């Protein structure tokens, strides 16, 4: 199981460290917007690395880039939860974790497209309408996509996440 609480603390501390080092003076609303834009780009990078939607020129997923962009997306989603004071939405109990890890893997083009678009839809609803339940759905879908669909293990995710944190 992922240690979501630890990951959440790490990304918050990293943001504070970078803010201090760079002397960033960004207001809270602009900060949320910036995190959200960065999250959107990370999700697109994740889809690019996975490549499931490339039907004209199909290719194998770039597992290294996929893992890297996946953990960036996870980190930004966690950071956004902190900015919105929605951290209670990202902590998982054993039952929620089991539902995610035991979910049927999506392998068909339409299923993967739908999952990706649902994440984007739910995140937009969370951002523009402040819908906490939409945010929770996006979070669970993102975890399911990485763990069930792409078979990323919690150890792989944790290690890549730690490497991302350590690079700063």
Predicted feature descriptions by range:
Residues 1-168:
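Flexible "arm" and connector segments at domain edges
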């Amino acid at each position: 199981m992922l240690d979501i609480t630890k990951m959440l603390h790490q990304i918050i501390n990293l943001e504070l460290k970078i803010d201090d080092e760079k002397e960033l003076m960004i207001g809270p609303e602009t900060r949320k917007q910036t995190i959200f834009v960065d999250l959107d780009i990370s999700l697109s990078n994740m889809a690019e690395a996975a490549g499931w939607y490339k039907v004209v020129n199909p290719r194998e997923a770039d597992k290294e880039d996929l893992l890297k962009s996946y953990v960036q997306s996870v980190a930004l989603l966690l950071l956004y939860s902190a900015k919105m004071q929605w951290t209670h939405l990202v902590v998982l109990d054993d039952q929620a974790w089991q539902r995610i890890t035991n979910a049927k893997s999506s392998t068909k083009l339409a299923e993967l497209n739908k999952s990706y678009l649902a994440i984007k839809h739910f995140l937009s609803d969370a951002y523009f309408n402040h819908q906490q339940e939409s945010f929770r759905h996006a979070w669970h879908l993102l975890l399911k996509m990485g763990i069930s669909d792409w078979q990323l293990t919690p150890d792989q995710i944790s290690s890549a996440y730690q490497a991302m944190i350590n690079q700063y």
